[in-house]
Amino acid sequence: MRLLALHVHDFRNLPQVQLTPSAHATIAVGQNGQGKTNLLEALYFLATLKPLRAGRLSELVRWGSQGARVTGRFLLKGAEREIAVEVGGGTRQAFVDGKKASSLEDYFGGVSVVAFTPDDLEVVKGGPDSRRGFLDRAVFNRFPAFLRESREYARALKNRNRLLREGHTVDAVYLEAYDETLAKAGARIYSRRRALMAELAPRAQATFASIGRTVDPAVYNYRPAHLEGDFAAADETALAAMLRESLSARLRRDMERGFTSVGPHSDDVSVTLGGRSARAYASQGQQRALVLGWKIAEIENLEAAMGFLPLLLLDDVSSELDPERNAYLMGYLAQSGAQVVLTTTDGSLVRGAAADDTLWLDVHGGQVAVRADAEPPPAN
């Protein structure tokens, strides 16, 4: 897979951007607040239909404009394909080769990206919600249908919570119907997460062993809370039954609190180092190495599953890594042959990922300019 062309119109602070990215590294350099992260987010939004940062869709539209549009032309398995997404009025529309996409699966059609941001480096010491989001982005990259499936679960959860807030006046028959819907949708989420972890965790653990600077082994694990039974061996039907049982057992508590306390939305990813919680006991450098190991494993896992490398998006990550681990990452990017778009405030930090065909960009005040020379711009 290769991104051949990118056109961005009125996305965040970017009025117009037209690029022919390098087949290898495209590096955007600029000070904070100038728009380099917005360029990366435009690409991420194009490939996933989800913003890279939390917020409303309306925030993606440049101030004073009616709508935003991002268009990308890709080479996929020898054939060119154009996808586009428009945002306006708080909604988004997706297009494939100039026509409205018939489904999410039709839209994605093999386009895959892996994003790596400074916020990701804080995942290990963050809260469960950040680790769930981190896991679910990886699940979506591996199984694009997960976007639709997670939305189905979110709708079912919202409906059940609405009924729970009615307290003891709620009709048990209605609640049972919502429990059934939620259990089936939740079982699918469990199954997707479990499948991804089975593929990715061993790779991440092996990568960490080479960069962690410790003999302590890393273990990444996902095991839902409040489920009784053999999670590892259960099929989706059994998982749904396990979730239904947990929903029933916690019904009184849920009615008192007005929300659903069990399900995929309340789970966590366990990361341990030498058998101890990495969140509590690992150093900051080790925590970041654990995340770096995960991201490299995600890239390698997607290549193994799809037969090609995803597009890589790195947002000023180098400034947050120590020199040794940054050198490891830059060397990996250069050797992998992947197409990568990086942002940085200092071009010297990412020189290790550059090649003769690297496209260097200067970003200032929402304007993106291609540098005529091949040398990285000096640090300011």
Curated annotation (Swiss-Prot):
Pfam families, alphabetized: SMC_N
Location within or outside the cell: Cytoplasm
Keywords: ATP-binding, Cytoplasm, DNA damage, DNA repair, DNA replication, DNA-binding, Nucleotide-binding, SOS response
Gene3D superfamilies to which the protein is assigned, alphabetical: P-loop containing nucleotide triphosphate hydrolases, RecF/RecN/SMC, N-terminal domain
Record keyword Transmembrane helix present: no
InterPro entries in the cross-refs: DNA-binding_RecF, DNA-binding_RecF_CS, P-loop_NTPase, RecF/RecN/SMC_N, RecF_2
Keyword Protease carried by entry: no
Domain of life the protein comes from: Bacteria
Annotated positions binding ATP: G30, Q31, N32, G33, Q34, G35, K36, T37
BP terms from Gene Ontology: DNA replication; DNA synthesis involved in DNA repair; double-strand break repair; SOS response
One GO MF term attached to the UniProt entry: ATP binding
Chain's role: The RecF protein is involved in DNA metabolism; it is required for DNA replication and normal SOS inducibility. RecF binds preferentially to single-stranded, linear DNA. It also seems to bind ATP.
Family membership noted in the UniProt record: Belongs to the RecF family.
Name by which UniProt lists this protein: DNA replication and repair protein RecF
Organism: Myxococcus xanthus (strain DK1622)
Lineage, top ranks: Bacteria, Pseudomonadati, Myxococcota, Myxococcia, Myxococcales
